[in-house]
């Protein structure tokens, strides 16, 4: 790394001399920089402790930001020049990102392809309306405003914006204005330090529009949301995984556990990857695989929320499960099914219970009064664990909470066969709750 820096700084030194247009022997790079459009670049080189390495054969290509470009960077990052110059590690990383090995003149710049820098990151140059435009690793762009400034050991191209290498997930969000509300939220929840750590993390990052929609949905102002630190922390942590998971590695249809308690799932649809959150709301991944130094970002169009209801509460909120809820209450199973679990419940509809009463030739009152039978029947509808549709075992006996011998079988077409040879169709799947998942069935299944 230092050998590359030594050779690069020699190029910068010559660049400043070339900018003076003098035929005299070159003067010190810092003296030249004082009256040159690359003054702040010269200060940055000095502040980074790199001036002693101004030698080396090269050749190199340097993309040199103007003073105006540095001023714009300070405004973008919300820091002063003194703060920037005090951070030698950041300066070294940024400065070496502006250098490419080899002499690449304007006519030879490879367009539309990744160009590796001395820093190790990549940038891309494209032709746009007759100009050459650089796109950095944060998706920011800079225009090449002057080209082919010849130096003894390379060439310099002036640019109108400081380009930045890939940063942490927080830095990547800070560099993109569409995440300004997300950044405010991370600051308010004191999560910036966590997400600036080594990670790795996967962040499902909601846009400003996604946050605006959430405020409308919850009936809150932004100030009220940012002031509610417990809620904000829970919501933000629900968007973060403790590992790097690229879009091609996302486990489709399976429970995904974030930093926050709970889970969500991701499904592949014709329009792309879609998240179903704990409240059964959906968010689309609109941009995937924005790589950061400590993880990866997937941009989403809706803020996802952890579940606020358990299995019993979710069933109680749906009028089509009113008989099921009555049965659970009569069997005194509510406390069990409200525990952390997780549980998978095959939930019969009201119509399924009515059909059972006819089949058994009994009344609801008589069935619900037989607590022992009711408990056996209801626990036969419960399987331990979060078994989403994609993971339902087919063609094999599945143990239930009714007992190790009280098993059921599910076919590939999602038809359950109970121990009496009766069948029930799974008519709706993957209703997520705080402590498990519900699959809706059209018939009450029965154990032996």
Please state what every model-predicted region is:
Residues 1-9:
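Bacterial N-terminal signal peptides that target proteins for export
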Residues 10-18:
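Bacterial N-terminal signal peptides
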């Amino acid at each position: 790394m230092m050998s590359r820096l030594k050779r690069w700084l020699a190029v910068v030194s010559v660049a400043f001399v070339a900018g003076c247009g003098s035929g005299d022997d070159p003067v010190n790079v810092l003296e030249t920089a004082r009256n040159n459009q690359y003054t702040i670049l010269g200060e940055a080189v000095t502040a980074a402790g790199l001036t002693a390495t101004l030698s080396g054969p090269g050749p190199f290509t340097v993309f040199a930001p103007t003073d105006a470009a540095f001023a714009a960077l300070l405004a973008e990052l919300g820091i002063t020049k003194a703060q920037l110059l005090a951070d030698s590690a950041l300066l070294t990383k940024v400065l070496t990102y502006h250098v490419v090995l080899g002499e690449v003149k304007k006519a030879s710049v490879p367009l539309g392809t990744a160009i590796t820098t001395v820093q190790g990151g990549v940038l891309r140059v494209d032709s746009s309306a007759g100009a050459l435009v650089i796109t950095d690793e944060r998706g920011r762009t800079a225009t090449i405003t002057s080209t082919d400034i010849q130096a003894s050991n390379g060439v310099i191209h002036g640019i109108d914006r400081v380009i930045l290498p890939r940063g942490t997930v927080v830095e990547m969000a800070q560099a993109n204005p569409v995440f300004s509300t997300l950044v405010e939220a991370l600051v308010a929840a004191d999560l910036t330090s966590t997400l600036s750590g080594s990670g790795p993390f996967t962040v499902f990052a909601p846009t400003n529009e996604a946050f605006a929609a959430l405020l409308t949905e919850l009936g809150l102002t932004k100030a009220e949301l940012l002031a509610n630190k417990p809620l904000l922390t829970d919501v933000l942590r629900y968007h973060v995984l403790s590992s790097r998971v690229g879009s091609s590695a996302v486990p489709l249809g399976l429970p995904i556990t974030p930093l926050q308690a709970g889970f969500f799932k991701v499904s592949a649809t014709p329009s792309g990857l879609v998240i179903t959150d704990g409240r059964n709301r959906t968010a689309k991944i609109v941009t995937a695989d924005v790589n950061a130094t400590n993880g990866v970002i997937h941009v989403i169009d809706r803020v996802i929320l952890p579940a606020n209801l358990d299995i019993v509460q979710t069933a109680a909120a749906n009028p089509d499960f009113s008989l099921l809820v009555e049965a659970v209450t009569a069997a005194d199973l509510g406390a069990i099914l409200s525990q952390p679990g997780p549980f998978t419940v095959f939930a019969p509809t009201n119509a399924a219970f009515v059909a059972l009463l006819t089949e058994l030739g009994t009344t609801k009152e008589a069935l619900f009064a037989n607590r022992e039978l009711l408990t056996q029947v209801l626990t036969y509808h419960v399987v331990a664990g979060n078994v989403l549709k994609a993971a339902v075992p087919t063609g094999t006996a599945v143990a239930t909470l009714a007992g190790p011998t009280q098993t059921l079988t599910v076919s590939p077409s999602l038809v359950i066969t109970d121990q009496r040879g009766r069948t029930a169709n799974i008519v709706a799947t993957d209703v997520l709750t705080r402590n498990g998942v519900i699959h809706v069935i059209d018939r009450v299944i029965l154990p032996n």
